[in-house]
Design a protein with these regions (language model features):
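Bacterial N-terminal signal peptides that target proteins for export
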Residues: 1-8
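Bacterial N-terminal signal peptides
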Residues: 8-16
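Sec/Tat signal peptide C-region and signal peptidase I cleavage site
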Residues: 17-21
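Extended soluble regions of mature proteins
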Residues: 23-252
């Protein structure tokens, strides 16, 4: 709970950094990667139309130990989007890196911006909760690009860096780094607390193909896309299997 509260506060400090281009009729939608809310949030996938892809997302979460070492959890999961903006995502459990425990898929999710539906399906029970999906293909999704300057009331400072252009798994990306420094005493800290967020954004796909979030209380989260393809995926991925029971939760 303390980690979640800390990440919430950090997200508020990062939020003023967003100075993205907007249209008068459609404000920009900005969502940073990382964090936890019962489940690791990972990278944000918007329902952009006309930009299909499939990839495997590799996650590593390093947390500090009291003796100066680190404890690393990892997984790999599949993410797919079609030209209509529908998204299929697998959720695999995080397991110790290099250990004997094998990761497994425990949840898969299917979202449809046209039907405004979100199926959250548990593999153990073969039950899908049908929820409302509020994002649309008309939303103006933009990367969370900020500016440098002091935080309000002398609480610290923020720094924005443009890392230039590169190529990630054969796709052009633009890199950015945001650093927030919290002064001693602001959050019960006796030394400056530094949180960094680096990401490599693909304008073509409107997603981050590499994202690194490093916070003092939650550790370091690294998300890396691999096996990226920009072809139209199989349509059966966006259909709930017959053996799954659907429970409609949209009115709750």
């Amino acid at each position: 709970m303390r980690v979640r509260r800390f990440l919430f506060i950090i997200s508020i400090l990062f939020f003023p950094l967003a100075t993205n281009a907007q249209t008068p009729s459609q404000p920009a939608v900005v969502r940073p990667d990382g964090g936890t809310s019962g489940r690791m949030e990972s990278i944000f996938i918007p329902p952009n139309a006309g930009a299909p892809f499939s990839l495997t997302l590799v996650t590593e979460w390093s947390r500090p130990l009291g003796n100066g070492g680190t404890f690393i959890l990892t997984n790999q999961r599949r993410i797919v989007r079609d030209s209509r903006g529908r998204i299929y995502q697998e959720r695999w459990i995080l397991v110790p890196k290099g250990g004997d425990i094998k990761s497994r898929m425990d949840v898969f999710q299917i979202t449809d911006p046209e039907q405004h539906t979100w199926y959250n399906c548990e593999t153990a029970t073969k039950v899908c909760q049908l929820l409302k999906y509020h994002l649309t293909t008309e939303d103006n999704f933009q990367p969370a690009i900020g500016t440098s300057g002091p935080l309000a009331n002398g609480k610290g400072s923020r720094q924005h860096e443009d890392l230039g252009v590169s190529s990630t798994d054969g796709v052009d990306t633009h890199g950015y780094r945001e650093t927030v420094t919290i002064n001693p005493g602001v959050m019960g800290n006796d030394k400056p607390m530094v949180t960094t967020r680096e990401f490599w954004y693909s304008p073509e796909l409107a997603i981050n193909l590499i994202s690194i979030v490093d916070a003092p209380q939650s550790g370091k989260q690294v998300f890396t896309a691999k096996d990226l393809a920009t072809l139209e995926p199989e349509p059966n991925l966006f259909v709930v299997p017959d053996e799954y029971k659907i429970v409609d939760k949209r009115d709750e």
